[in-house]
Amino acid sequence: MIWHVQNENFILDSTRIFMKAFHLLLFNGSFIFPECILIFGLILLLMIDSTSDQKDTPWLYFISSTSLVMSITALLFRWREEPMISFSGNFQTNNFNEIFQFLILLCSTLCIPLSVEYIECTEMAITEFLLFVLTATLGGMFLCGANDLITIFVAPECFSLCSYLLSGYTKRDVRSNEATTKYLLMGGASSSILVYGFSWLYGSSGGEIELQEIVNGLINTQMYNSPGISIALISITVGIGFKLSPAPFHQWTPDVYEGSPTPVVAFLSVTSKVAASASATRIFDIPFYFSSNEWHLLLEILAILSMILGNLIAITQTSMKRMLAYSSIGQIGYVIIGIIVGDSNDGYASMITYMLFYISMNLGTFACIVLFGLRTGTDNIRDYAGLYTKDPFSALSSALCLLSLGGIPPLAGFFGKLYLFWCGWQAGLYFLVSIGLLTSVVSIYYYLKIIKLLMTGRNKEITPHVRNYRRSPLRSNNSIELSMIVCVIASTIPGISMNPIIAIAQDTLF
């Protein structure tokens, strides 16, 4: 009898929770319509996988890509709408959040074609891979719109858990297992430090969790200049630093890049930085409004260390993925300049513009790495020697993306860096911009070294891996090459049409 009553109470409680969730979704669903599209895509993937056989795998890719494209379309239709706060203040929609969500969706849309042939060749589980990618994308989108401390913690954990699973997806690979272990341990430690910083903010503001209410609470309690805020600032900087992976919080990056499946690395290398940058700008700019000098100093130190260490250590690398890992550490140093400049002097606009170009440059380079790895089974930089003689398209595409990463005119990377450094110079960050210019010259050296290997035509320098390289026929419609074409175009053409891109980026205000 007691069990029967308890069972009825459980059913009633579950029904109330479900009805409350349905009520929230019904009245607030329009605010998260792009996210709802991804959720429905996830449900469809599960239904198709459980009711069909392996022959229906093209449908899985189609549903994943379609849900991402539809989500992008929904975001574009919502552009320029008035800022709105929904879900009892937990979520905010405005142009600033939406452009970061667009960048995350764009990354995921380009990464799925990169993964098709890789998954088929390595015989990885397709459905789970796509589920993790879409769920990580969903977590990144919620993080961009998060407006309170709880959502800011839960959303990146959703992204991080999927990232851990993706990095260890090739369970039989020892390097993949090692990468996952390091990633998980350091990710758990950083999350703990982040929560510790949030607890100081929560206590100092008098129990507030919404970002703007925290500012009001700090004013009411007169705690905005207290030592507790300094502790919160340092702890939150460390926690977010793990997601952005600037020096000295970069230790996990090279090992995870080298050990994880290459399409996963391509996905993580851009989406994690976009989502973390969106979160960092809101956290530093709103709750720490009264401590702007302190967090500016912290970020300047991180930017200098990242630009110097990342680019110098990248020179010594022999693996393409490890080289790009250290290159990404240097690149995030450039992005931090935009965060420091802030909304004044177009700092955020320059950061968004550069991140858009960085996505295309980075994914285009990873597309070549995925293709070369599938054809040869190697990742060593020296083994790329003479690739132009066997696959001119792949070699030229990789060369263009690397030149754009180095900031060579008239490619997109040059104009992105020029705009970013110019905004930093106008804001008075002369030393920081000077370091950025010098380290950009250093980066050009190791990018050109790789390009020289790609273009060499002397038989004695062509490696056995390239001699045995088999290019896929044009009629096979290789999805990797499709992504590569899109990324190469985006890495070159936008350089001569910067004004519309900058105008859109400047329209992103809190």
From Swiss-Prot:
GO biological process: ATP synthesis coupled electron transport; photosynthesis, light reaction
Source superkingdom: Eukaryota
Membrane topology note: Multi-pass membrane protein
Entry similarity comment: Belongs to the complex I subunit 2 family.
Transmembrane segments: 24-44, 57-77, 99-119, 124-144, 149-169, 183-203, 229-249, 295-315, 323-343, 354-374, 395-415, 418-438, 484-504
Organism for this UniProt entry: Nuphar advena (Common spatterdock)
Record flagged with keyword NADP: yes
Biological role stated in the UniProt entry: NDH shuttles electrons from NAD(P)H:plastoquinone, via FMN and iron-sulfur (Fe-S) centers, to quinones in the photosynthetic chain and possibly in a chloroplast respiratory chain. The immediate electron acceptor for the enzyme in this species is believed to be plastoquinone. Couples the redox reaction to proton translocation, and thus conserves the redox energy in a proton gradient.
InterPro entries linked to this entry: NADH-Q_OxRdtase_suN/2, ND/Mrp_TM, Ndh2_N
Compartments where found: Plastid, Chloroplast thylakoid membrane
Record keywords: Chloroplast, Membrane, NAD, NADP, Plastid, Plastoquinone, Quinone, Thylakoid, Translocase, Transmembrane, Transmembrane helix, Transport
The protein's name in its UniProt record: NAD(P)H-quinone oxidoreductase subunit 2 A, chloroplastic
EC number(s) given by UniProt: 7.1.1.-
GO cellular component terms listed in the entry, alphabetical order: chloroplast thylakoid membrane
Primary gene name: ndhB1
A Pfam match: Proton_antipo_M
Major localization listed first in the record, in broad terms: plastid
Subunit record text: NDH is composed of at least 16 different subunits, 5 of which are encoded in the nucleus.
Catalyzed chemical reaction(s): a plastoquinone + NADH + (n+1) H(+)(in) = a plastoquinol + NAD(+) + n H(+)(out); a plastoquinone + NADPH + (n+1) H(+)(in) = a plastoquinol + NADP(+) + n H(+)(out)
Gene Ontology molecular function terms on file: NADH dehydrogenase (ubiquinone) activity; quinone binding
